[in-house]
Amino acid sequence: MSITAGPKVTTTAALVNTDRKMNNHHSTQVLHGSGQHGMQPSGNNVLNGLANGATGLQSSASSTSTRDDSTIVGLHYKIGKKIGEGSFGVLFEGVNMINNVPVAIKFEPRKTDAPQLKDEYRTYKILSGSEGIPQAYYFGQEGLHNILVIDLLGPSLEDLFDWCGRRFSIKTVVHVAIQMITLIEELHDHDLIYRDIKPDNFLIGRPNQPDANMVHLIDFGMAKLYRDPKTKQHIPYREKKSLSGTARYMSINTHLGREQSRRDDMEALGHVFFYFLRGQLPWQGLKAANNKLKYEKIGEKKRSTNVYDLSQGLPVQFGRYLEIVRNLGFEETPDYEGYRKLLLSVLDELGQKLDGEYDWMKLNGGRGWDLAINKKPNLHGYGHPTPPNEKSKRHRNKFNQVPLAVNNLNGSNVPLQSHSPLPGGTDLTQGVSNAPQQPQQIMSQQQYQQHTQQRLDPMSYEAYKQQVQQRYAQQPQPTQQKAQKSPNNDTSQQQFSQNRQQQPQYQFQQNQPQNGKVQVADSNSEKGFFSKLGCC
């Protein structure tokens, strides 16, 4: 049984029917929105055969855009402003040029140690048609990146929580909690566990849409199969597992290195509910010498915090929920409907109803949230960025005031002289030094105009692409001496460079479906014990 707050809405499938008929390239994008009442969300090898013929993955040759316009990907998705960034890569808003439907475009470097977009795309296709799950339209390669295009949504619950003074009313928490439980139930029904429950990954819809205040779930890069889709055989219980998720919300069993299952998603939801009700959790702000000790402290604090103390001054039903899910067995099926009824009883006791009214609808004199007023606090979600910090402001001002050096014919940078040099050749842009001065190069008017034209909007795709190209160009190349020290002394520097260039393609292809079955790597195989941990 699915319970949602507010009027029932249709899925996004109808909106993209025209697009899917006209485009053979499926892709996915992340969410984001602007306006009133809304803003901004891997399984393992058991996934064999689950998405046979359903994912529509294209090879790199067929999925790479052939358009001359550098701001168009996937043949007809035009890239707009940057709206988010994080460890995964960068997120841009965009538009489907065929039907003018807004989309989100997620960029992931192809050379990343743990690519996730391909597995995330598969998960979106598995969940396609589920209420509260954005539609995935396209996945492919564009230059140095993997690209995912999905529905554009509104702000995350974390953003709305900030805008509402970092405290939700009991009524709003019940509204969102019921929807969050239903979304996780839908994921579990498709044999997947989420493993990274946090407010940042739950978004509401875009303004002026039927689902403007409906909670959606995004970002399935950490999702994993907990049972075989065909036989329904549950994964075995194991210990000494690496931590996966966000330390602030993860379950106690996850801190203890135990294999995650459905119970861990439900416990993490309980921690989010108390976060919304209390404003913060008792294990926030703990200090330690390093991250490993910090996560251990968080786990110890969770174990030592009594649920009764956590529920002080709050409806007892929230504490009861946390007690129930913490006592679930490893393979036990959660009572999703029972949890919803338990939380609905809170409204009954308060004499309130599930009427679809949320705290964020009261912002700005009852007009609701507005990005022109309510700023996105950071770029790690899927909202609009805030102005740069003081350090970046200084960098920006310096960039705007001092002409950059122009590369000479030898490829080295030389300092530039002001356009109006002072008598005696004095240049105020240079520091005072007794060392012999290098020959200075005066920038011509034409060079200055070209330099000015290169000042791109830092939120634009062109600026991001320029940064990526510069970063790759600055990567050190292996010397001939290093190549001779390699195990194969016959390998030339040219062959070594070719192997490096071919490596990303191999990494992308190695998870391609084999023998008609989808092979998905277990994200626990990543190097590093804390490689999957989020903010705590």
UniProtKB/Swiss-Prot annotation:
Keywords: ATP-binding, Kinase, Lipoprotein, Nucleotide-binding, Palmitate, Serine/threonine-protein kinase, Transferase. PROSITE patterns: PROTEIN_KINASE_ATP (PS00107), PROTEIN_KINASE_DOM (PS50011), PROTEIN_KINASE_ST (PS00108). The active site is at residue 196. InterPro entries: CK1_Ser-Thr_kinase, Kinase-like_dom_sf, Prot_kinase_dom, Protein_kinase_ATP_BS, Ser/Thr_kinase_AS. GO terms for molecular function: ATP binding; protein serine kinase activity; protein serine/threonine kinase activity. Residues 26-68, 407-524 are annotated as: Disordered. CDD domains: STKc_CK1_fungal. A lipid is attached at residues 535-536 (S-palmitoyl cysteine). ATP binds at residues 83-91, 106. Residues 43-65, 437-453, 463-514 have a biased composition (Low complexity). It catalyses: L-seryl-[protein] + ATP = O-phospho-L-seryl-[protein] + ADP + H(+); L-threonyl-[protein] + ATP = O-phospho-L-threonyl-[protein] + ADP + H(+). Residues 77-361 form the Protein kinase domain. Its EC number is 2.7.11.1. Pfam families: Pkinase (PF00069). Gene3D superfamilies: Transferase(Phosphotransferase) domain 1. Residues 26-42, 407-420, 427-436 have a biased composition (Polar residues). SMART domains: S_TKc (SM00220). Belongs to the protein kinase superfamily. CK1 Ser/Thr protein kinase family. Casein kinase I subfamily. Casein kinases are operationally defined by their preferential utilization of acidic proteins such as caseins as substrates. This is Casein kinase I homolog RAG8. It comes from Kluyveromyces lactis (strain ATCC 8585 / CBS 2359 / DSM 70799 / NBRC 1267 / NRRL Y-1140 / WM37) (Yeast).
